[in-house]
Amino acid sequence: MPCVQAQYGSSPQGASPASQSYSYHSSGEYSSDFLTPEFVKFSMDLTNTEITATTSLPSFSTFMDNYSTGYDVKPPCLYQMPLSGQQSSIKVEDIQMHNYQQHSHLPPQSEEMMPHSGSVYYKPSSPPTPSTPSFQVQHSPMWDDPGSLHNFHQNYVATTHMIEQRKTPVSRLSLFSFKQSPPGTPVSSCQMRFDGPLHVPMNPEPAGSHHVVDGQTFAVPNPIRKPASMGFPGLQIGHASQLLDTQVPSPPSRGSPSNEGLCAVCGDNAACQHYGVRTCEGCKGFFKRTVQKNAKYVCLANKNCPVDKRRRNRCQYCRFQKCLAVGMVKEVVRTDSLKGRRGRLPSKPKSPQDPSPPSPPVSLISALVRAHVDSNPAMTSLDYSRFQANPDYQMSGDDTQHIQQFYDLLTGSMEIIRGWAEKIPGFADLPKADQDLLFESAFLELFVLRLAYRSNPVEGKLIFCNGVVLHRLQCVRGFGEWIDSIVEFSSNLQNMNIDISAFSCIAALAMVTERHGLKEPKRVEELQNKIVNCLKDHVTFNNGGLNRPNYLSKLLGKLPELRTLCTQGLQRIFYLKLEDLVPPPAIIDKLFLDTLPF
């Protein structure tokens, strides 16, 4: 049985269906890309003088409809399907022709070449009448060719196959063509070409002309040819690998040193402040553990070991001393009552309360210490010009000079102590009347307390606020027996080994306390509680505080003693007023009258 063999050409690996090429050998050949009119619209240029038409050419859908019934002239084609490179045969039988003879050179095919999937049978249909009467087709040039029968068999089989393709979904034609760019082409040189409306020229071209697209050759011997669509050089793998290997700079990390400060202790990265100083997490934890555990360190060198990021763990003594030197405050370390609560304050009560005074700075004890240091004379600038340790001095001179000296020392201390009181956090926020009342009521107590803390009772040296140093015997005629009580109190106070922080709190508590006649006693009480808590925290975690559980009680017990000494001072002033040897200054007289207990 005669059969027509269809050639299956090999397509390059990875080729898409849109890139497969079809070639039809005959005078009436059509490209398979034009067989999908729902995706491609084109115009036809009628340039062949042998074909004339009075009206426009029929639409492409008309041609396709005619394929279903048959044409008098069926376009011959050679259908080339780029699949796998294997050969298969299409069997044609029961073909009845009208006045046509099979060409003698058609090679017979054997049954062994039939595909295993089965045979495909086709039958011709009756010739239809052209839909356009004025469209004339020349028949004689096609059938005069001796090999026209062979071409007709091929055309009929390919045409029927194209009709079957119309019944199945057709992938959209690709209007873009891609070319392999030569090696070394830069990535930015990629181009894309898009052709305009497709034209179908009717001029015949020489048979056997060839076109090369993307390295594949196909023959276009018929008058209808598909022009090249466009070129788009492909991106070479070498350039792509270079782009992938290029390292993109990453954005700066959140914890980079450029966005943060440095630790004041070791120089490591520090995000925020801890205990009053910008420090790293390591130095913060070291300082916290040292203060809470009251740790004692010993330097094995000369107490000047380098403390940096690399050597900060070598000497704990020098590291802790540097923490204190840069300003870290021990009193800010959390107490036992706040451990495990992340420093959260108690929840606010639902009931409204009176507005509290502005919160003092976090380092309250540091402010108290600073105020005390600023209000005391430096040890290098003391005035020893009037100091005499001769016991006969108390017998020399008259009482007027000693009484005037007594008044001068009191008035000179009053201005200095007032300046110290104004530096206490929260004191300046109180009403002015309450400030004056607290200061005047506690002036003599503060005078005695500060004098007792500065003086050296063993040597009998009394150091006053203005820097004047006098011997105890030089003050007996002016101060009377009051000076002996002051020296005794100084001796007991210094035996307690009170540090400057605890003493600053005691001095503040001597003034900020409950007094008769306060306008806002609640605010004074709140400020007093803050100072008491600050003193308690300091004593609890201070060196030696844990070994002396009654140390805080002894410190607070000095306040009633000051009240007794203040009463003795008022009695001395009252006696001098009665003696009337030297009139007291107005400020001392007012102080005496305002602070009388009766």
Curated annotation (Swiss-Prot):
Q: Where is this motif: Nuclear localization signal (NLS1)?
A: 338-350
- SMART domains this protein is in? HOLI, ZnF_C4
SUPFAM superfamilies xref list = Glucocorticoid receptor-like (DNA-binding domain), Nuclear receptor ligand-binding domain
Keywords carried by this UniProt record: Cytoplasm, DNA-binding, Metal-binding, Nucleus, Receptor, Transcription, Transcription regulation, Zinc, Zinc-finger
> Where does the UniProt annotation locate this protein?
Cytoplasm; Nucleus
Task: Place the motif nuclear export sequence (NES1) on the sequence.
Answer: 443-452
Q: Where does the record place Low complexity bias?
A: 8-22
Biological process GO terms, please? Answer: adult locomotory behavior; cellular response to corticotropin-releasing hormone stimulus; cellular response to oxidative stress; central nervous system neuron differentiation; central nervous system projection neuron axonogenesis; DNA-templated transcription; dopamine biosynthetic process; dopamine metabolic process
Motif nuclear export sequence (NES2): which ranges? 568-577
Q: Which Pfam families match?
A: Hormone_recep, zf-C4
Instruction: Give tissue specificity per the record.
Output: Brain.
Q: Which GO terms describe its cellular component?
A: cytoplasm; nuclear speck; nucleoplasm; nucleus
List each copy of the NR LBD domain by range: 360-595
A Gene Ontology molecular function term for this protein is: zinc ion binding
Any signal peptide, and if so, which residues?
none
List the InterPro entries. Answer: NHR-like_dom_sf (IPR035500), NR4A1-3 (IPR003070), NR4A2 (IPR003073), Nucl_hrmn_rcpt_lig-bd (IPR000536), Nuclear_hrmn_rcpt (IPR001723), Znf_hrmn_rcpt (IPR001628), Znf_NHR/GATA (IPR013088)
Q: Please describe the quaternary structure of this protein.
A: Interacts with SFPQ, NCOR2, SIN3A and HADC1. The interaction with NCOR2 increases in the absence of PITX3. Interacts with PER2.
The domain-related comment in the record is: The ligand-binding domain (LBD) contains no cavity as a result of the tight packing of side chains from several bulky hydrophobic residues in the region normally occupied by ligands. NR4A2 lacks a 'classical' binding site for coactivators.
- List the protein's name: Nuclear receptor subfamily 4 group A member 2
